[in-house]
């Protein structure tokens, strides 16, 4: 009976199905697909041999790609060294004359000589060097062709003439000196009696730069420039300095006599360079003081100097309303002889806003003297209204001169503060100089 119990008992169908299910679950967990489980032993061996051969092929491919990668790295290193040698200074300065699109469509016959440079597709360039030689470059060089345009200044290799680097735009050194690096310290509060003029200047110059969207919402075009005119000493240049101090724009100060040059075309080139520099550093303001030096009415003259001044003014007219208007460049011009200016300068579209600076009235004169006396040690008994009544026909500069003369008189007598009598004596001093000047010019 014990031997009979040692014999294996046949498994039931339920137990066999459970084992098969367990095997399938383990196969799925190991990543073995159902297709492999249904394959025979010979098929599995054959599949394994195929996979081994594919692995060998992939390993050889990886080895080949690794060798190619190393060869490419060596080639890149070699080319980098060649570029470094070619980029050694000095460069030959050249100008880009023209950019050409090259796309050869004609097919060469079999056996014909083929010029590889002529078969390149893309951009080619024509340059003119500083030695006055013109070259055609089938290959531009190290600079992207999309970043080049005719007229650009570039540095090329002196042997191969390949473009190695773009150079900054060349401007006249006199134009660069026109840029105001240090901001003036004047403020609108330092100007007395010109509230209306300050408002007109802010509306025409400052507002279009700081709040451009207001003009776009209304659909109006802001003024291109402002002409400030009036007698000498009424605050035209002072207001321009205050405008330069209050805005963050680049400020270029030109003097009219500075644009009158001896050589033909030199003054016009200064005007072109000044506007080009202003466009590059936009937003910017160009202030032209003493505009009557170049803006006089045109007339027939046989003198070369007069014709050169007229050519300079024509270039200024062209820049004011050229073919490409620029709303980020504003022009402020000042003169005390508006009657002799050319009508072409005064028409709308060039200097749209005309701001008159009259002689200050009594209230304005009192305000001007108060402003210039703020930092002085002044006695409380000084009556500025009475001083303003005594300074009839005085401009702003003469009112300032009264304060300076009063301070000098107080200094002469060793006083520690300025009195009303000092101001009255200062008025007499300025009036005496004024009469002397009138008699001198008469």
Curated annotation (Swiss-Prot):
Subunit structure: Component of the 19S proteasome regulatory particle complex. The 26S proteasome consists of a 20S core particle (CP) and two 19S regulatory subunits (RP). The regulatory particle is made of a lid composed of 9 subunits, a base containing 6 ATPases including PSMC3 and few additional components. Interacts with PAAF1.
Role according to the record: Component of the 26S proteasome, a multiprotein complex involved in the ATP-dependent degradation of ubiquitinated proteins. This complex plays a key role in the maintenance of protein homeostasis by removing misfolded or damaged proteins, which could impair cellular functions, and by removing proteins whose functions are no longer required. Therefore, the proteasome participates in numerous cellular processes, including cell cycle progression, apoptosis, or DNA damage repair.
Primary localization: cytoplasm
Family: Belongs to the AAA ATPase family.
Pfam families: AAA, AAA_lid_3, Prot_ATP_ID_OB_C
Localization in the cell: Cytoplasm; Nucleus
GO CC, any one term: P-body
Entry keywords, A to Z: ATP-binding, Cytoplasm, Nucleotide-binding, Nucleus, Phosphoprotein, Proteasome
Biological process terms in GO annotation: blastocyst development; modulation by host of viral transcription; positive regulation of transcription by RNA polymerase II
Encoding gene per record: Psmc3
Gene3D superfamilies per record: 1.10.8.60, Nucleic acid-binding proteins, P-loop containing nucleotide triphosphate hydrolases
SMART domains: AAA (SM00382)
Residues recorded with modification Phosphoserine: 12, 379
Record's protein name: 26S proteasome regulatory subunit 6A
């Amino acid at each position: 009976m014990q031997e009979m119990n040692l014999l294996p008992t046949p498994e039931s169908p339920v137990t066999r199905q459970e084992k098969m299910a367990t095997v399938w679950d383990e196969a799925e967990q190991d990543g073995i697909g159902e297709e492999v489980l249904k394959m025979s032993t010979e098929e599995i061996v054959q599949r394994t041999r195929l996979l081994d051969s594919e692995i060998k092929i992939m390993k050889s491919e990886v080895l080949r790609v690794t060798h190619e990668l190393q060869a490419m790295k060596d080639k890149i290193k070699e080319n980098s060294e060649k570029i470094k040698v070619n980029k050694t200074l000095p460069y030959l300065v050249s100008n880009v004359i023209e950019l050409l699109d090259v796309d050869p469509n004609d097919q060469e016959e079999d056996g014909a000589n083929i010029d590889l440079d002529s078969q390149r597709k893309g951009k080619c360039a024509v340059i003119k060097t500083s030695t006055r030689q013109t070259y055609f470059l089938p290959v531009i060089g190290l600079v992207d062709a999309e970043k080049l345009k005719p007229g650009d200044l570039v540095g090329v290799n002196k042997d191969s003439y390949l473009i190695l680097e773009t150079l900054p735009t060349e401007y006249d050194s006199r134009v660069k000196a026109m840029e105001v690096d240090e901001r003036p310290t004047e403020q609108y509060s330092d100007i007395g009696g010109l509230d209306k003029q300050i408002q007109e200047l802010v509306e025409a110059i400052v507002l279009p730069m700081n709040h451009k969207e207001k003009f776009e919402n209304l659909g109006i075009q802001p003024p291109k420039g402002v002409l400030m005119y009036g007698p000498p000493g009424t605050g035209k240049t002072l207001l321009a300095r205050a405008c330069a101090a209050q805005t963050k724009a680049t400020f270029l100060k030109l003097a009219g006599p500075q644009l009158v040059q001896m050589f033909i075309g030199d003054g016009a080139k200064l005007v072109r360079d000044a506007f080009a520099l202003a466009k590059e550093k936009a937003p910017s303001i160009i202030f032209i003081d003493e505009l009557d030096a170049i803006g006089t009415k045109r007339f027939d003259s046989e003198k070369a100097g007069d014709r050169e001044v007229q050519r300079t003014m024509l270039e200024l007219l062209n820049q004011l309303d050229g073919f490409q208007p620029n709303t980020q460049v504003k022009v402020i011009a000042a003169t005390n002889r508006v009657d002799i200016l050319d009508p072409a300068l005064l028409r709308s579209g060039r200097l749209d806003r005309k701001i008159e600076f009259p002689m200050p009235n009594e209230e304005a004169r009192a305000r001007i003297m108060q402003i210039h006396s703020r930092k002085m040690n002044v006695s409380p008994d000084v009556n500025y209204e009475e001083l303003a009544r005594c300074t009839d026909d005085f401009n702003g500069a003469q009112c300032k001169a009264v304060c300076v003369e009063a301070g000098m008189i107080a200094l002469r007598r060793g006083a520690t503060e300025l009195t009303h009598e000092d101001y009255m004596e200062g008025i007499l001093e300025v009036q005496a100089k004024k009469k002397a000047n009138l008699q001198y010019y008469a």
